[in-house]
Amino acid sequence: VHLNVLPREALLKEIKRILMSETLTIQNETFNNMLADLQITDYTASANVLALVTAESRFIKDLKINVGNALNNTQYLNRKEAVLIALAVAVNEKFVVLQESFTNLAKEAGATDAEIAEVVACTSLMNTNNVFYRFRHFMQKDFYTNQPAGIKMSIMMNPVTGKEFFELVSLVISAVNGCEMCVSSHEQSVLQHGSSESKIFEAVKTGSIIKGLITILA
């Protein structure tokens, strides 16, 4: 950037940006290696990151190990499934840095544009359903329970990711958003479509780890 050609207001803003980027350079090998694993190359440290790095917190190592294990678990989730679940949580939490990261990683793992779009759509639908059905569950009134939902859910029919995985993503997001009725319903559906409790356990654990990662990075 040629600072001498910028208007005064823009000049001050650019100088502040440069100073901030230099000030917030993260001098922690473990943390930087985690960012590299996630293919995050342009990141401005959050206050939470700075707190951990400044104190040389042991949690940084825990976080890196947990994230690595979650995304590379091949016993019950393959790489593509794990990254797509992580993407769903990033979308749910509106954290663009990880949304872009997991989109790229998902494509590297073989996910198609249609599968990625479906995960985004599924996450949006779950945000709708989680609020609606949590309200019904809270109120426990016949009137609300018996009223037709009137919510279009065509993406649940013949999903490109398959019924089992679509329901699995729905379950994870419902767990993140705290909808008991939705969690119970989707857990039963995942099992009915041939999945196992072990896979469900790993999927929800993956979602919880990514939620924790976002708490630090955002």
Positions of predicted regions on the chain:
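Short, Lys/Arg-enriched N-terminal segments with co-localized hydrophobic residues
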Residues: V1-L19
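Functionally engaged cysteine thiol sites
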Residues: V1, A109, C182
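Short, thiol/selenol-centered motifs that function as redox-active sites or metal-ligating centers
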Residues: I85-F102, I173-S185
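Preference for long, well-ordered alpha-helical segments
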Residues: L168-L171, A175-A218
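Acidic/histidine-rich alpha-helical segments that form the ligand environment
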Residues: A149-M181
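Acidic, glycine/proline-rich low-complexity segments that act as flexible tails and inter-domain linkers
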Residues: M20-E81, N92-V160, S189-Q192, S208, ...
